[in-house]
Amino acid sequence: MNTKAVIAKGFQLPGHFFFSNYFYGLCAVALSIEASLQQQFPLNGFLYYFLVFITTVLYYAYPYIKKTTKPTTNPRTLWYNEHYQLMRWNQIIITIILTVALILFLKDHGSDVLQMSFRQWMVLAVFPIVAALYYGSSSGMGKYNLRRIGWLKPFVIGFTWAGLVTVYPVLFQSVINEQEYAPGWVGIFLFIKNFMFITLLCIMFDVKDFATDHLYRMRTFVVRLGLRKTVVYLLLPLGLIGLSCFIYYATTHRFSWVKISLNTIPFILLILVAISLLRRRRPLLYYLIVVDGLMLVKAVCGTIAMLYF
């Protein structure tokens, strides 16, 4: 392989990593660890976090299982079409790995799962149900799935992610310790915080799909309000409200200034990234790396703040 080919292949690596949704899996694990520490619960074992990772990767790859024949300029769709066979085998292998991991998980914790209370089952079930309704089905529900309700889409994604990374780690601890799941005010605050943060990221991500959503009459906030109004009247005010609420919470609970500073970094970056969307059109990788990357930044900052300050 010549030098130019090696360099070209190197430039493709970020696309492979982000288009394959492994980055989402990494973010889900990192946010789960952060939420456990912030709620002062023990970290779960490797198998738990592996299931979080592999399930997230598989879920986000679901829309691309079928090779599309429609004309498209979407880089991610084009990438999946180009690497269709590779990703098909990737899906099969991941599904097999997930099945084996679930068997091992149930082998260790099957008795605990069987003893779950009705309340625990309800909490466990609500987030996968909402996640399934987001995609719908190709038979009857696909025509009316939640994904087609443009303004609702960010809230559905934010709710599902908040449940996965905030509720599930604590729920799992309550199950294996044979305790009733009873989230405190800290847990509720963190759920709302993660819900709002990820919802704002989803609204920013809709900027990328403005032309397509407008064509297919997907009434997202960006389509309804326009880019400038979405940023100025929605993203910036909500980002500032989230930042203000955290600072108020942190000061009333006597957080150290270092801890407060670390946890404000993700909100400040979110506001700056939202403003950057006004300047010029951004490529898809910008949204995958920079916008979605704020989830990882939030997790890292929150984890460092809890461990060392």
Question: Which stretches of residues belong to each language-model region?
Answer:
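Interhelical loop and helix-boundary elements at the membrane-water interface
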Residues: A5-L26, T68-T95, V113-R119, Y135-F159, ...
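Central hydrophobic cores of alpha-helical transmembrane segments in multi-pass inner-membrane proteins
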Residues: V29, I33, V52-T69, F127-Y135, ...
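Membrane-water interface at transmembrane helix exits
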Residues: S36, Q40, P63, K67, ...
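Catalytic cores of Mg2+-dependent Asp-rich isoprenoid enzymes
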Residues: N2, V6-Q39, L43-V52, R224, ...
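Membrane-embedded alpha-helical segments that form the functional core of polytopic membrane enzymes
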Residues: L43-Y62, A125-I129, A182-M204
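Acidic (Asp/Glu-rich) catalytic motifs at the cytosolic membrane interface
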Residues: V52-N74, F197-V222
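Transmembrane helix-loop-helix
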Residues: Q91-S139, L235-R282
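Helix-coil boundary and interhelical linker segments in multi-pass alpha-helical membrane proteins
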Residues: A30-L51, I103-W121, T166-I192, I247-V258, ...
